Design a protein with these regions (language model features):
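A short acidic-Thr-Gly-centered motif at the start of a beta-strand
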Residues: 18, 55-64
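Short beta-strand scaffold segments in enzyme catalytic cores
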Residues: 23-29, 58
Length: 188
């Protein structure tokens, strides 16, 4: 709630339909299992509804409906864009820079991932114990990255920026400046 109180101070709560640039904010209606695109109404409500990460941030109730992060159903909503001239995608679920076991890695492949799992389960005492959070977090990012890659392949994009999912973790809002700097590196 502290972060969202700060968000209210930073973002002027304008009506989306009155903005100079047309935008669509994607969220997920968790009550009715459907994707919702918000194109009008309160900017704050739309942003708040779209960033409720399941298990970490409670759903946002708006007009009696509970909303969670739009990425649950559509992590890279290219298909919902208002303006489709030159599409620059920013995929926040890119391949991690480290393996689940802390080793630096280049672009991850499923073969590398399964080899890591094989190594882990082969009684190697040097590997760290994977907790349920680690496994769940990485699994969700793998799913979202695959869905994002499918969207990129399907649409004509101008530039694709793939940010490794381990640049930051959910709720590391205090790292905003560092995260923006990291993102700028991937844009070049």
């Amino acid at each position: 709630d502290k972060v969202f109180s700060l968000l209210k101070k930073i973002i002027k709560d304008e009506k989306i339909e009155n903005l100079n640039i047309p935008i669509s904010i994607v969220t997920t209606d968790i009550d009715n299992n459907k994707e919702v695109v918000i194109k009008e109404g309160s900017m704050y409500d739309a942003i708040r509804a779209s960033c409720s990460i399941p298990g970490l941030v409670k759903p946002y109730n708006l007009n009696g409906i509970n909303y969670v992060d739009g990425g649950v159903l559509n992590p890279l909503p290219i298909n919902k864009l208002c303006y489709k001239e030159k599409i620059i995608t920013v995929n926040l679920n890119g391949h991690p820079t480290t393996s689940l076991f802390g080793k630096k890695t280049k672009r991850r492949s499923y073969l590398n991932y399964f080899n890591s799992l094989k190594s882990y389960f082969s009684n190697n005492q040097n590997t760290k114990h994977l907790g349920i959070y680690d496994i769940t977090y990485r699994s969700v990012h793998m799913i979202q990255n695959q869905l994002s890659m499918m969207q990129i392949e399907k649409h004509n994009t101008f530039k694709n920026i793939n940010i490794p999912c381990d640049v930051c973790h959910p709720l590391e809002f205090y790292k905003a400046k560092q995260i923006l700097e990291e993102g700028a590196k991937f844009y070049k």
